[in-house]
Structure formats: C-alpha cells, structure tokens
C-alpha cells in the first residue's frame, strides 16, 4: 500500500522509540540504487520524495498505525523494520499462535502471491547486478559451415586464448583489430557484449571479462581458432549496448597480446581495458604449449592468409581413423583426405604421371565426372549392418564415400574391396574408377614446416599407394576383361606396372590371367618336346641344361648352364619345327634342372617367376614330371626351390614321365555308342568348362542375357553355354527316340545314365543336368515299354539323380553339395542366373530416399559372382583332349525339333511300327512258354 509521508514518518518514530536497541536504518549507495529501480523516485529513509510502498502491522498484531483498506493485514516482514516484527510494545511474544480471520487469510494470500518484493540486505562483497544481466555464451562454428555459428558453448575457460597468445608471441606475430572504444557513460552499460569476427567472436562479461577462442571439433581433428572482434553487438534490442573487449597491438612491448582483466562495476561501468601485470607476462613466457592449428593466421599488416581446407571426407570415422593437424605454413592446394594428402589439380601439373597421356587426362576428367577427389564431406554417411559372421559390413552410402572408403590409408577391408570390384559397374564406370585411383596414387606429399608432420604424411601416402596397388591387383584377378576390352585402360595398366618395379604382386596377377586359359597338359607337351628336341640324338649335354641318360646315368653331371639357357631357347624352338619325330624316339630320357624349366616357361610365356613356379607345381601334382630326390620318384617342388636358392653343391634334376607322343589308335566313329561313357563325360566336361571359364563378369550385370535384342552381343559366352546346354539335352532325347529297335533303345538309355553317373563323379553338374533333362523330356518319358525293359539298377540310379537335381526347397540337395566346393567342378549355370534374376528384381540399385548406392544388393550379387569365379579358377587339368569325340560333338550330332521328337516317340511304340510289333510278339511268346 502507499502511505502519506507524514504517516510514514510517525510510524518510523514509533518503531524507533519502542525498540531502543534496534539499529538505525541507513541506506547505502548500493541499496539506494536498488531502491531507485524497484521503488522509482522514493527514498528508503522515508523522508521526502513522496510516499513509499510499505507492508506493516494492522489490527491483529500490534500497535502499528491505521492501515488503508487496500492492505489491512499485518505482515511479519517489514522492509523498514530490521527486527522483522510488527513493531510496538504490544507485539506478540515468541511462540504464541494467534488465529487469523477469514479476511486476514484472504488478504495475506494476495500479498504472498502478489508483486511485493521484500528487501534483504546483500553481502557487501557481492555486487548487485541489473535485472537484465545474463550469463554470456560463446558461439561455436561447426565444420559444415566453416565459421558460421550454429552451436553455443558456455565461455568458462580462457586457457585456449592464453596458449594461442603465447604461440603468437613466440612466433613474433601481431594481431591488429579495429577497436571500437566508444566510452559509454550510461550506468546501464554494465552488461556483456559479443563482438563478431571473421571466424569467431569474443564475449565479455561484467563479472569476468574473459575471452575464449572458438574451438572447431571434427570426428578426429580439433582445430583451435582465435579471431578478433571489430564491432560490438547487443544481446537483444532492448538491452543496452556494451563495449566488446579488444586486443590492441602494442609495438613497444614486443608485440605481446595482453588478456583483459575483470572490471569492477559499482554504480557505473567504465570502458573495458586490456592490462596485464609483469608477473603474468613472465608466467606466460615460461609456459609454451604446443602451437594450435589456427584456421586464420594474421600478420602485422592485418592481411589474412587463405584458410587451410578441411578434410574432404570423414567416411573412415568408424575404422579407427586419425589425422594430423595441419600447420599454418602448409600450402593451400592440398587436402587431408582421411589422413592422406590429396593435391588439388593445378594448371602447372606435369604430364609425367603414372599412366602416360591417359593419366594426364584423368585429372581433367575427375571434376567433370563426379568430382570424387574434391568432394567436401563433413560426416560419414556410410551405413553398416551386422552380417551372419557378426561383422560390420557397408550396406548403403553415397558413391563418392564408397570410393573414398575403398582406397583409405588403413588396413583394407577385403570383403568390401571384393564386393566393390565385382559390382562397381552398377554405379560407376571403369575409367572413372581408374582415374580416381590414379589421382590418389599420384598425389605428392607437400613439405611442411614440421619434419615430424611431413614424415607422417609420407607414411600415410605410402600406405595409400600400397593399398591402391592391391586394389588394382584384385581388380585384375576378378575382372581382367575391363582392361582387355578397353585399350586405353590396358595401356595405362601396363604403364603403371613398368613404372612401379616393386609392384610384383600386380605383375603376377596379370601373368596369372595370361596362363589361366592355356590347357596345362598342352603346355606340358610343348615344354617336353622343345626341351627334348634341344638335345642332340646322341644325348650330349646341350645348352639348355639337359643331360642324357644313355650311359645308364654315368654321364649325369650338374647343369650350371641355367642362366645361359634362355639365350638358346629361340634356336631350340626353331630346330624343333625342322626336326623329325624320330629324334624324340631315339632319346630314352633326359634330366633337366629346375632352372632350365623355369627359364623356358618365363621366356616362352613372358611371365614372372611366381607364375612359372605355380605352373610347375601343377605339373608335379599331375605327376607328369618326376624328380631324382633322396628316395627317387617324385619330390615336392618347394624343397627343390630351397635347394636351388641355397646354391647347393648338387642341383636337383627332373625328368618327364612319358617321352612317347600320345597316338590315338581309336578310329573315328559317328556313333556315340562306339565311345566309352567315361570318355564322353570327360570330353563334354572339357568342352563346356571352356565355355564356362570364358564367361566374363560384365555379361552377368543388369540381366543382359535376358534382353532379346542385345543378349548375343552383351553376353556372348553365356549364350554360347546356354545354346550348348540346350543342344546336348535335345541330342539325348533325339538319340533315344530315333533308335527304332527296342533293345537298342534300352542300351541307349543305359549308356546315357552311365554318362550322367560319371558326370556326377567328376562334379560336372552342368552336363548332368543336360542329360537328366533330355531323359526327362516328354517324348522320352512317355516310352513306357522302354522304361519297363530297363534294368532295376539303372532305374534306381536315374531316380537318385533326379532327386539330386530336384527343385524342391530351393535346390536343397544340389546346393548342399555345391557348398563343399570340391574342385574341379562345373556347376549348373542356370541356377546362378536364376539367383541373379531374383536379386535384380527384388532390389533397386539406388535407395529411393536419398539416391545412395544400395550396397546391400551389391553384397548379394557379389556372393553369386564370387562363387562363379571360384569354380572358374579350378579347371580340369588332368583331362586330356580326345579329338575324335570332340569332333563328333562339334559336327556329327543330330538334333530334332520338339514336334518331330514327339512324332517319333508316338511311332516307335505304336502298332504301326513293325519292329515294335515284332518285339512285342516275341515277348508274348516267351511269356506263354
């Protein structure tokens, strides 16, 4: 309530007379300042200046004067009575409770819930803040915005500023700012202000004028940034303006930056100044923390250098990624990509890069294709899932981050590398991928001011280059057709091999692709003939390192001419064409050193040592080459290598197990009944496996074999194998229904069932499916009399083979057998094509939400592609070619259309067929007897 001045004065006198021991109320300047804000224009001493708002005792509690109707209730809290009582002699004694009336309760509730604010004296050490004072917050720029602030952190520590100031002091750098030191005499300017700079802000507070640096934190790199403030801003439009703390350059004090001290605020706020004591300067000089990595570095003239670019990718954030803070002296045309240095393309780049002219054009095509190397990504967007083996696998992500993850500096994820190489054509072209790999490979490490940092950069780049060579090696092993079909890529690949002498494994991968399609036994025959023909008929020692055993081994000598044998290989090959076969017959046997055979293979096939070694190991496994070991016979080639490498006194000698040329004594026949079932199964295996091995991965992409207009162009090998399979199945049915005599027809059935049994034994499931399909043809299965005449053993065998190839439960029996992966094996290609069809139809290449690559589909496709390639790498080395049988299948087999097959089937078991009537009458006569 509001009282008149005279009434207030009389009340104060009465209180002071009744309470002589109570202290006299005096208003301090700070209290008066508070009173001016809460009770404007009123004094606390009650004298002059108008009436004050008071809460005092009424009728229920003591002798206080009469109250106005607006506030008739006594209050124990009187802002003018420091004793806290109602005042007067008749005040209630302590501990006595007096019931209050209903009116008093209601009015007291209004007072307690109203705007009345009782005065409580503050401690003298605590400064009184304005009602609009607030705790300042410092703005923190995120990596995405590179300086634009969207987060806030509370400015509590000034250690970063101190360390950065000492770094600038030690490097003799000065920071100049445009200081706005407008002195504001208004007492309401004691709030905090924030000044915005180019890359950060300084925020000053009234309690502690602290200046904190802007800290930019990434997934693995923390960069401390400090900038200056050039203008002041108020926290809100209604708040009074305040002066921001500034850092002034002082050339007289050795360009040292002095941090601001907290200013004491009483009734008015003086301008904020920067001062630092001598002891603080000495302590600052003693402590020299490691220099941070400023985003902006300033010099004495105030000009700013370009900011260091951030990392272009954080796609390796989940794979123990680390990075090194870049120093301010690093050139601005380099990027730290997942811990590696990636040089941006400049106009002065030389054309002597790996890959020749094609590689020089690669840097120009990167920016136009997808700009993979220069894409700036702040957060990893790769999505992972747990697979069946409880391992994390990539299931989705942007194309550029998938490529970055492929060639990172860490240990390679070979499952991801294999999946990527086998399926990258779904979202990227081969040239684009090779260009990106070459850009990463050719990146040169920029020199920095720190030797330690430069060494770390070199180690990172060496790991990246090593990983890229491994990736290209996997690419050659899995998809060499990408280089064979593209002449420019093929040239760049061989240029890379020539310019990288330490890339031995990449060279071996190319050599394996050269030799993979050469029949091993044909190669053996050529090796044997040329080495034997290089010897004279009398068995003397030749330049090729061979030794004759015509004198029962008495002339066996150590051959030390292995190094010179390569010079005579051309002459020996020329002499082999003019020599007669009688020369080979005259030679009983000869012994050759390991070096001699290795040199012949390396020079004749233009391959490396490792590939030649693998060929000899296969020949030893086939037991077509023997060794004079300790116990005679065959020895392991690895032990021979150790002996040859250690340069032992006597090098191991090898011999060919068969020196006579294979002469086929069988006469060519146009009837398959003249050939054994085992030979037919083997020759069909060789014919079809050659087609299966020729299937390229690109023929399986995008279901190209199902497009009627282009299937023979895009998938020629798949269509050749499909055509061959249909041809064999129709040939089986044709041979059965075109055999008129019932007994011969039963023999034909028995022969085909035997061929199917041999196909299963040698793991030729593709030919097995063809034979069973031909026997299950409706034109054959309807021959009831023929099947009745078939012996029980063959009937049971046929039923067993049919159950093995049943499609029930998704080919359960066949898939379980295929999982054992016994090699060599020719799988049924139709099931692989069916699986690819289901995966393609049920999954999209890109996710519908954000157009990211659906890498889960790529993993599913890779599981099929990997299985196909596994069986392609294990051919039937032990099978020799039977030219008569292969000629029969190429030229002399007869195939009838479906209509004619059914017509023959109806005729051979109809009464109109005299042979059928004759055989039936004989059977009836035998039955009657």
From Swiss-Prot:
InterPro entries, A to Z: Ras-like_GEF, Ras-like_Gua-exchang_fac_N, Ras_GEF_dom_sf, RASGEF_cat_dom, RASGEF_cat_dom_sf
Name of one Pfam family that matches: RasGEF
Chain's gene name: gefM
Compositional bias (Gly residues): 44-67, 192-202
Induction, as annotated: Up-regulated by Pseudomonas aeruginosa, PAO1 strain and PA14 strain infection and down-regulated by phagocytic stimuli.
Composition bias, Polar residues: 1-15, 247-256, 295-305
GO (cellular component) term, any one: cytosol
Ras-GEF domain segment(s): 676-911
Protein name: Ras guanine nucleotide exchange factor M
Low complexity: bias regions: 16-33, 68-80, 169-191, 203-246, 270-287
Residues in N-terminal Ras-GEF domain copies: 390-528
Keywords: Guanine-nucleotide releasing factor
Job of this protein: Promotes the exchange of Ras-bound GDP by GTP.
Disordered, as annotated region: 1-102, 169-316, 540-583
GO MF: guanyl-nucleotide exchange factor activity
Gene Ontology biological process: chemotaxis to cAMP; positive regulation of calcium-mediated signaling; Ras protein signal transduction; regulation of adenylate cyclase-activating G protein-coupled receptor signaling pathway; regulation of cell motility
């Amino acid at each position: 309530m509001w009282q008149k001045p005279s009434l207030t004065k009389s009340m104060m006198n009465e209180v002071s007379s009744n309470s002589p021991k109570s202290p006299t109320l005096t208003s301090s300047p700070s209290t008066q300042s508070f009173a001016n804000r809460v009770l404007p224009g009123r004094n606390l001493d009650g004298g002059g200046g108008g009436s004050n708002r008071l809460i005092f005792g009424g009728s229920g509690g003591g002798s206080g004067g009469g109250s106005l109707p607006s506030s008739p209730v006594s209050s124990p809290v009187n802002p003018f009575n420091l004793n806290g009582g109602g005042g007067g002699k008749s005040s209630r004694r302590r501990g006595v409770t007096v019931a209050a009336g209903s009116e008093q309760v209601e009015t007291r509730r209004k007072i307690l819930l109203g705007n009345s604010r009782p005065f409580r004296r503050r401690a003298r050490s605590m400064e009184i803040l304005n009602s609009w004072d607030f705790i300042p917050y410092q703005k923190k720029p995120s990596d995405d915005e590179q300086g634009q602030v969207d987060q806030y952190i509370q400015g509590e520590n000034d250690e970063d500023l101190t360390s950065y100031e000492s770094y600038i002091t030690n490097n003799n750098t000065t920071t100049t700012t445009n200081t706005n030191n407008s002195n504001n005499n208004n007492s309401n300017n004691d709030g905090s202000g924030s000044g915005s700079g180019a890359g950060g802000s300084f925020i000053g507070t009234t309690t502690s004028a602290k200046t904190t640096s802007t800290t930019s934190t990434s997934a693995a790199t923390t960069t401390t940034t400090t900038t200056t403030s050039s203008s002041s801003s108020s926290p809100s439009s209604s708040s009074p303006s305040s002066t921001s703390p500034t850092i002034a350059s002082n050339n007289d004090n050795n360009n040292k930056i002095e941090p601001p001290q907290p200013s004491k605020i009483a009734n008015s706020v003086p301008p904020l100044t920067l001062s630092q004591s001598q002891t603080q300067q000495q302590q600052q000089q003693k402590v020299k923390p490691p220099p941070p990595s400023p985003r902006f570095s300033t010099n004495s003239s105030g000009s700013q250098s370009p900011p260091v670019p951030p990392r272009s990718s954080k796609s390796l954030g989940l794979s123990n990624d680390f990075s090194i803070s870049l120093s301010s002296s690093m050139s601005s045309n380099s990027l730290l990509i997942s811990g590696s240095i990636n040089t941006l393309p400049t106009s002065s780049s030389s054309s002597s890069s790996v890959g020749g002219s094609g590689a020089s054009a690669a840097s120009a095509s990167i920016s136009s294709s997808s700009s993979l190397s220069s894409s700036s990504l702040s957060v990893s967007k790769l999505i992972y899932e747990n697979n069946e083996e409880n391992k994390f696998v990539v299931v989705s992500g942007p194309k550029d981050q998938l490529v970055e993850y492929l060639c990172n500096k860490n240990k390679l994820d070979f499952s991801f590398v294999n999946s990527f190489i086998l399926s990258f054509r779904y979202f990227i072209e081969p040239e684009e991928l090779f260009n990106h790999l070459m850009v990463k490979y050719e990146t040169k490490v920029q020199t920095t001011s720190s030797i330690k940092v430069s060494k770390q950069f070199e180690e990172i780049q060496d790991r990246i280059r090593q990983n890229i060579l491994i990736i290209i090696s996997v690419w050659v092993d899995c998809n060499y057709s990408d280089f064979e079909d593209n002449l420019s890529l093929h040239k760049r690949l061989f240029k890379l091999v020539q310019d990288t002498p330490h890339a031995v494994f990449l060279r071996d991968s190319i050599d394996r692709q050269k030799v993979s399609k050469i029949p091993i036994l044909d190669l053996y025959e050529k090796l044997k003939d040329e080495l034997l023909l290089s010897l004279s008929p009398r068995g003397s020692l030749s330049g090729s390192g061979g030794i004759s055993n015509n004198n029962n081994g008495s002339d066996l000598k150590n051959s030390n001419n292995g190094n010179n044998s390569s010079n005579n290989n051309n002459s020996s090959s020329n002499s082999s064409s003019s020599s007669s076969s009688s020369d080979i017959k005259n030679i009983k046997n000869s012994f050759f050193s390991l070096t001699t055979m290795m040199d012949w293979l390396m020079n004749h096939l233009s391959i490396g040592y490792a590939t030649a070694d693998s060929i000899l190991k296969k020949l030893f496994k086939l037991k077509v080459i023997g060794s004079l070991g300790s116990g005679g016979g065959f020895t392991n080639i690895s032990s021979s290598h150790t002996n040859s490498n250690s340069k032992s006194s006597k090098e191991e000698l090898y011999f060919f197990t068969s020196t006579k040329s294979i002469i086929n004594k069988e006469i060519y026949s146009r009837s398959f009944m003249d050939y054994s079932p085992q030979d037919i199964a083997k020759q069909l295996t060789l014919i079809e496996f050659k087609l299966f091995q020729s299937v390229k991965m690109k023929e399986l992409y995008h279901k190209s074999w199902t497009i009627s207009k282009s299937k023979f162009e895009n998938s020629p090998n798949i269509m050749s194998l499909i055509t061959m399979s249909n041809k064999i199945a129709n040939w089986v049915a044709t041979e059965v229904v075109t055999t008129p005599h019932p007994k011969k027809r039963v023999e034909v059935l028995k022969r085909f069932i035997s061929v199917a049994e041999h196909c299963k034994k040698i793991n030729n499931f593709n030919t097995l499916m063809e034979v069973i399909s031909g026997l299950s043809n409706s034109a054959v299965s309807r021959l009831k009399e023929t099947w009745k005449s078939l012996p029980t053993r063959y009937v049971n065998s046929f039923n067993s083979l049919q159950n093995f190839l049943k499609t029930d439960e998704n080919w359960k029996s066949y898939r379980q057998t295929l999982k054992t992966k016994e090699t060599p094996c020719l799988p049924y290609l139709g099931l692989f094509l069916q699986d690819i069809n289901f995966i393609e139809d049920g999954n999209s290449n890109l996710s519908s939400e954000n157009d990211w690559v659906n890498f889960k589909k790529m993993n599913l496709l890779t599981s099929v592609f990997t299985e196909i390639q596994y069986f392609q790498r294990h051919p039937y080395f032990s099978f020799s070619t039977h030219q008569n049988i292969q000629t029969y299948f190429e030229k002399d087999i007869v195939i009838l259309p479906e209509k004619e097959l059914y017509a023959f089937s109806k005729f051979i078991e109809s009464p109109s067929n005299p042979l059928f009537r004759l055989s039936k009458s004989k059977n009836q006569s035998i039955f009657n007897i």
